[in-house]
Amino acid sequence: MTDIDVRLREDVHVLGELLGETIRQQHGDAFLQKIEDIRHSAKADRRGPGEQLSSTLADLAEEDLLPVARAFNQFLNLANMAEQYQLIRRRDADQPEPFEAQVLPELLGRLKQAGHSNDALARQLAKLDIQLVLTAHPTEVARRTLIQKYDAIAGQLAAQDHRDLTSAERQQVRERLRRLIAEAWHTEEIRRTRPTPVDEAKWGFAVIEHSLWHAIPSHLRKVDKALLEATGLRLPLEAAPIRFASWMGGDRDGNPNVTAAVTREVLLLARWMAADLFLRDIDALAAELSMQQANDALRKQVGDSAEPYRAVLKQLRDRLRATRAWAHSALTSNQPAGADVLVDNRELIAPLELCYQSLHECGMGVIAEGPLLDCLRRAVTFGLFLGRLDVRQDAARHRDALTEITDYLGLGRYADWDEEQRIAFLQAELKNRRPLLPAHFKPQADTAEVLATCREVAAAPAASLGSYVISMAGAASDVLAVQLLLKEAGLTRPMRVVPLFETLADLDNAGPVMQRLLGLPGYRAGLRGPQEVMIGYSDSAKDAGTTAAAWAQYRAQENLVRICAEHQVELLLFHGRGGTVGRGGGPAHAAILSQPPGSVAGRFRTTEQGEMIRFKFGLPGIAEQNLNLYLAAVLEATLLPPPPPQPAWREVMDQLAADGVQAYRSVVRENPDFVEYFRQSTPEQELGRLPLGSRPAKRRAGGIESLRAIPWIFGWTQTRLMLPAWLGWETALTNALARGQGELLAQMREQWPFFRTRIDMLEMVLAKADAQIAEAYDERLVQPHLRPLGAHLRDLLSQSCQVVLGLTGQPVLLAHSPETLEFISLRNTYLDPLHRLQAELLARSRSREAALDSPLEQALLVTVAGIAAGLRNTG
């Protein structure tokens, strides 16, 4: 065990001790002893077939339920914080740099050895286009208030690492830790009300303000340094290899709370926040840039000012203040922007560049390369809008709107037309100069909302918006329909309209749809930049299981690369991944390197969801590590793409996918008891009551198909069966081995990044799954006639584990990663009581009608939050 491991254990021990002291102060020694007894029972039950823990929890008095749940939840959050800090802890001089810090310099060395010239490397790095799209899927259980306290705790862990602290200073740090832990303990974990879409957007802005704002300039300094050392060339000022976008306040698919008015409000709040953040930077710069000497270009702008740099910054500061004031007043009025309001990012960047060039020309390069360069990098990356807001809506809503319009105009019903009729109508109207809608048209509420959203898109500055994403897209007409609605709303500039292919059938059909679309007269001429296509991971996995879904996603991308090349159109693939394996999640670096060759051509767009935003970008140091991984992976996938899979591998994958989907659907779709078992054995029904996201957990109607991917995954994760991530693989791999394909599978795992990544992700999720915990839920919650189904599913889980061990040749899952195994083991001591307590609470809750704010229901919600924190990638 390294010294680093020892320090992590010490941190966890100290935080646990301080939490214990806090609990003792509020609840007394006897209660703290009860917590310790529960923890020891959990450990004992892990070592043998004990029932100690369940009986201890069943005997808990009603008033103890909530504080017990809170104690274990708080400990897991503190352990998370310690683990996160561990990743960015300062190393001693004799310790190696973490992989994330070395990944780019090492890659640049390999690329040079592979024959890439210095110029080519610098050019490619400068034009990388990586977009991380922050989304507010309701898996971020922790409240923002608590997240800020946990971040402050990380700050104190860093403070106590300083070797030169006096004993008094060390005591001060411990007191601050004690106070922060007490503050967290006395703060409610669970929101009493659902967040609004605007609340979610503010949470996204907070991630930028507290973390990414600091991480980006530091990350780009290191990229610049690595490039300079490898090639002798600098990263250009205008380069922004990684930018951010958001769905918070723009994603209205299935969320009636995201209206046109909400989208307008979020766009204005982003402008207010950006102006405010840049004002802080400019104030600091104005204090520093007191120099007198300036070049002619700067003098031309400010005349004979004794402090020319401050004069330039004052002009910019005045305009930023005007922008902030206007954005604030526009939230409550329709006040138009005055001439002083900044609208174009160049208006922000140009004065900063002017100062930068002048300082260099006047021999003050060392000053130019300081905070001024950081501010410039932020201006290029975040701009006046922080990031671009995407709009997303279901294709059916556009079809319904057009049907109402054509019906009103006496043209027939758009919904009843075939694809060719729709395309002919849409193309004719897109060319037509007259408006489609008469001024006196009064649409139904749903159509009015679609049209109002399009008007907001048309009115917003181009740089404030990203893509208009069409979920459940299935035809070329779905894209043209949105283009026509945007034209009707007055949009005159190009906007990326992006079909999202998400079910298995839609993924298989993505190629033909795009072939048809790109072949339409005039369509390609209207494209400005690449054709963007979104690949859905969540719904395809829920529809067909991860075996078939992963292969369908891979094949769809291959087809799209080929078709776009045939039409001489550049392609941007947008990956709609979740935090979990069942929703396309997993380590980003490995995932990017496992994409089909040619699919990452210097461009990569992906969603970052829910709690994964906090784990990957919550602290500046961790954000920097993840930005490094993204940048290096996209550069490597662009310049050293993997070879295409061998024909024999494709045949194996075809068979694995066919066997996987059949095995998955035989359980999920064809077993008549399955839905009832799911509802009884997991907290799925109760999750709908959780005030998590602004979006309902279900679509408008239906059974398992109507359930959104998130509660579907979340429910199985809470019980540790993890079913969506592995179901189907056990049969597919067992059948392949029975066909004598073991050596071929081993070859695929060794030589094909796509297959290796799939198996690695499968192994990770199986290591977190726990049949014993899942069985405990069944025993407490499931009616006797449904229990054989649970036993069958646990047998399939065991089969999955055995076949993966056979494939990897390891004695236990994750044997190659003892540190990860140790983390899982450490967490289980605190997770086990939460799981058993949750099963007990569900049983009590279902036997009576409890009010949402009763201690019983609150305790239940806390167990959900605690398990989510303990398992991290929850949904």
UniProtKB/Swiss-Prot annotation:
GO terms of molecular function: magnesium ion binding; phosphoenolpyruvate carboxylase activity
InterPro entries per the UniProt record, alphabetical: PEP_COase, PEP_COase_bac/pln-type, PEP_COase_Lys_AS, PEPCASE_His_AS, Pyrv/PenolPyrv_kinase-like_dom
Catalytically driven reaction(s): oxaloacetate + phosphate = phosphoenolpyruvate + hydrogencarbonate
Keywords, sorted A to Z: Carbon dioxide fixation, Lyase, Magnesium
Gene3D superfamilies, alphabetized: Phosphoenolpyruvate/pyruvate domain
Cofactor(s) named in the record: Mg(2+)
Pfam families: PEPcase (PF00311)
EC number: 4.1.1.31
GO-annotated cellular components: cytosol
Keyword Mitochondrion (UniProt): no
GO annotation terms (biological process): carbon fixation; oxaloacetate metabolic process; tricarboxylic acid cycle
Transmembrane segments annotated in the record for this chain: none
Enzyme class, spelled out: lyase
Positions of the catalytic residues: 137, 542
Stated role: Forms oxaloacetate, a four-carbon dicarboxylic acid source for the tricarboxylic acid cycle.
Family (UniProt): Belongs to the PEPCase type 1 family.
Full protein name: Phosphoenolpyruvate carboxylase
The organism of origin for this protein: Pseudomonas putida (strain ATCC 700007 / DSM 6899 / JCM 31910 / BCRC 17059 / LMG 24140 / F1)
Lineage: Bacteria, Pseudomonadati, Pseudomonadota, Gammaproteobacteria, Pseudomonadales
